[in-house]
Design a protein with these regions (language model features):
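HhH-family (HhH-GPD) DNA N-glycosylase catalytic core used in base-excision repair
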Residues: 1-212
Length: 212
């Protein structure tokens, strides 16, 4: 009899797309700028909605946003905005569409300054993943001090729709933090060679801790 796989408590066991994301992507360190930009776009669009909604619309987002090529997205104009707002395959929110285009331009500025966005991004955790030891869904904070500090710098640089909660979700997604629960099989895979770091959690005002 096959032994049941132990996972984090948040991915629905009857949702193959969600499980695939948890098992193969979430928390894996990302150093590729295009993939980083993809997650920044998706995280900003997810704000206020479920991540499941974004996952199921991800292929449509990829097509609508030029395969997440920041240089191409940065050149989007009024006609592109109109096109995106008529695209039923994505989340049609004008503010978020405009924010994605703005963020593409800011993304390019960071690349120009640091060489790659990844180099800038990873500097916020000392260029190596932070390994937490969450045991239950209640342990997850909505954001940490690192997320607050980075969100503040992103705002200073002109990024939008990237507050501390969204930024922390991004940090979890791209592996800046290993936030799989300690009993999850992915925690052990991703934790190899990474020391545990005690991180001060900031639950904000009435924030409710969640995983993904």
């Amino acid at each position: 009899m096959a032994r049941a796989v132990s996972r984090c408590p948040w991915p629905p066991v009857d949702d193959p797309i969600y499980l695939k994301y948890h098992d193969e992507e979430w928390g894996v360190p990302v150093h590729d700028d295009r993939t980083i930009f993809e997650f920044l776009v998706l995280e900003a669009f997810q704000a206020g909605l479920s991540w499941r909604t974004v996952l199921y619309k991800r292929p449509a987002f990829r097509q609508a946003f030029a395969s997440f090529d920041a240089r191409r997205v940065a050149r989007f104009g009024a006609r592109d905005i109109h096109r995106l707002l008529r695209n039923a395959g994505i989340i049609r929110n004008r503010q978020k569409v405009v924010a994605a285009i703005n963020n593409a331009n800011r993304f390019l500025e960071v690349q120009q300054e640091f060489g790659t966005f990844a180099k800038y991004m990873w500097s916020w955790v000392g260029h190596r993943p932070v390994r937490h030891r969450w045991r239950t869904l209640r342990d997850y904070p909505p954001y940490t001090e690192d997320a607050v500090a980075w969100a503040k710098d992103l705002k200073r640089r002109g990024f939008s729709f990237l507050g501390p909660t969204v930024v922390y979700a991004h940090m979890q997604a791209v592996g800046m933090v290993n936030d799989h629960t300690v009993d999850c099989f992915r925690y052990r895979v991703l934790a190899r060679g990474i020391p545990i770091r005690n991180t001060r959690r900031d639950r904000g005002r009435g924030g409710e801790a969640t995983g993904r």
